């Protein structure tokens, strides 16, 4: 018998670490249950954090005082800002990470956390009392009483590795799957399915001909993920770049019937946006090559991750096709690539708080909800951990709007639409991406963290100072101004309309930069770099943001129009039975969510609104009669 906890988090991966940390920061007495303490923070697949859309999530996790941004900065060995030449709204920070440094940094963060206890072992079942979560039952029979549970099982629920025709029960290489919890979720009546993901072979970098491959360098001036990181201290390395060849493709095509994915033995659906090399050859057969990034797994590690050739072909076929790739002709394979399929829960079973609708006190986060990626998992973990703590303390949950964060976009997509394949974050999923940028994540979400009670003192002080600097510099930029005639004398092209324009307004002009304006106003050279960057981007988007603000107001109004938990969607007489069934399954909590259910039309929304207004009027009349 263990001591009682407010929150028990099952799983020590990226979702579990963030969930445990968020619950503990909020003040909940928290337990993190994991198979092995030393496996906390392990990067199971690619050794990288961030990217397009994903980098936004990492910045948002950091703005909420989560762990991933700081840990990535401590472990990053090749920082790059993707889409640097495009607009700020779609830029994506990314870094290669040293696997060992990442794991060690995450474990340091977890070990230093107050209110957090690590319990090693295998969680086997969840005990219920009056239809609510009451305890976690361990495989050894011991019991952990608790007020809420966050389940972050990753690929461990009935996990099955495939290498050709070989099947290995495992959550990841060398670790057994979780069978008991999968049975528990089925017993509790949750809708479940199977998904698949894959990973490439690991190569011995000492056997690669590095002179035969191209190189990709890190950015000269690396940009950290975390607001709290001043400088990146690790040496920055290069990655290799090579391509598959027609010879590679022929070997794959000739043996594709041996692939676990093409032989019919895998029932799970894989991620469309991270296809296996078999999928690439099948879907894009006209191409003569596919790019491969040779990514070192650490500063002191000769293991290479060949990003772009995940596969479930037999090991001997993998060796054959890999050795037809330039630079890899003599390579030694340290571990074959494989596919892994696992159970997941239909995320439409969840509320926006990530609590199960049918099981009060049970929260789910990460791949169990049908997502793929460390960043998606970490963001869900933070939300689930915080809301589990709020639930355990009988407080209202915190919901994230899709108008204020990529986290909100992801959770709304999952809980209102569900998934047919592993869900990955992209900037294109966010309607309001002009306002959801990586540069303003702190401005958007750190006040949310402060209000929720999960913001550390050091970050709070630094953020307060940053806001003060921002206000001062913004005022200066709006104070400094110039007339069209003065601008013409100084070589600045403005409309000759007689109106003075401030520096802040000038930054909205195409190709007008703070650096160029500093030639005319030298005081702009003395600005803090981060403050200057935020304000330059803010000013350049100001006109567009004004236009978008009306749409955001409309969305927030619809989010405020709540749908009662017991609302009878079958009573919507003007809707098709198919649409009623979709609404019953999705159980939208507000009009904004209902509008995103597949098949909903403006006419259907009008019917729903009319019935809600009628119900509100009826309840008001009943209240008056009882007074």
UniProtKB/Swiss-Prot annotation:
- Role of this protein: NAD-binding protein involved in the addition of a carboxymethylaminomethyl (cmnm) group at the wobble position (U34) of certain tRNAs, forming tRNA-cmnm(5)s(2)U34.
Where does it primarily localize?
A: cytoplasm
SMART domains xref list: GIDA_assoc_3 (SM01228)
Q: Name one GO cellular component term.
A: cytosol
From the Swiss-Prot or TrEMBL record, give the protein name. Answer: tRNA uridine 5-carboxymethylaminomethyl modification enzyme MnmG
Member of which family?
Belongs to the MnmG family.
* A Pfam family that the UniProt record links to this protein: GIDA_C_1st
| Summary of subunit composition and partner proteins | Homodimer. Heterotetramer of two MnmE and two MnmG subunits.
Q: Which UniProt keywords apply?
A: Cytoplasm, FAD, Flavoprotein, NAD, tRNA processing
Q: Which PROSITE patterns does the protein's record reference?
A: GIDA_1 (PS01280), GIDA_2 (PS01281)
Task: Extract the InterPro entries matched here.
Answer: FAD/NAD-bd_sf (IPR036188), GIDA_C_N (IPR049312), MnmG (IPR004416), MnmG-rel (IPR002218), MnmG-rel_CS (IPR020595), MnmG_C (IPR026904), MnmG_C_subdom (IPR047001), MnmG_C_subdom_sf (IPR044920)
Q: What is the lineage of its organism?
A: Bacteria, Pseudomonadati, Pseudomonadota, Alphaproteobacteria, Hyphomicrobiales
Q: Which HAMAP family match?
A: MnmG_GidA
Q: Which SUPFAM superfamilies match?
A: FAD/NAD(P)-binding domain
**Residues binding NAD(+), per UniProt:** 270-284
Q: Which cofactor does it need?
A: FAD
**What Gene3D superfamilies is this protein classified in?**
FAD/NAD(P)-binding domain, GidA associated domain, C-terminal subdomain, tRNA uridine 5-carboxymethylaminomethyl modification enzyme MnmG/GidA
- Please name the source species: Agrobacterium fabrum (strain C58 / ATCC 33970) (Agrobacterium tumefaciens (strain C58))
GO MF, one term, reads:
flavin adenine dinucleotide binding
